[in-house]
Amino acid sequence: EANGRTPKEHADLTAARFQETWELLDVVPDRFIRTTDPDHAVAVRAFLQQVYDNGHIYRDTYAGWYCVACEAYYAEDELLPNPDGGPGLDPIHERPAEWFEEDNWFFRLSAFEQPLLDWYAANPDAVGPVGKRNEALGLIKGGLDDISISRSSIDWGVPIPWDESQVFYVWYDALINYATAVGYGADPDRFERWWPSVHHIIGKDILRFH
């Protein structure tokens, strides 16, 4: 809004910058996928509907410290001290977090704590390097809280199929993009050829979200 652009126009500009980066690196992706792609929206709604039908999603009120730039909530102990004495700073952008409350839909991540530990034990080489694997294990062993997966305060996003007054939170919606890119929800044969024999290269600062 400050730049006189809609969210879609701003996202288009950002996507173009990423595509230019690939060209500079002489990398030609099979597909440059975005969360605004129509087939991704269809896949997200189908995926989350199944998760909802399986009883892993419920409604509750979320309250916490939110960073607009990160589009993420932080626990009190995750924020950095504010030298001005105000609200704590988010650890990435070092901007004051905002206290935020709203009714959201939640995913029962806590129910998957032991299954995740079992998966890591059965797949010791699935996450690397070792330091990052241990970091992920530490997060799980420290206890997993249920996570908010929707937002009612914005309309930029994929609408929730059973409650279109809310949209999916980007950090839940975007991760499904990996599956969409190889055919989930649109091309079953292609999806079966690729998944789960895939390798993800991610930034070390977003390990927690993944």
Provide a role label for each language-model segment.
Residues 54-63, 76-85:
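Short, flexible, mixed-charge glycine/proline-rich loop motifs
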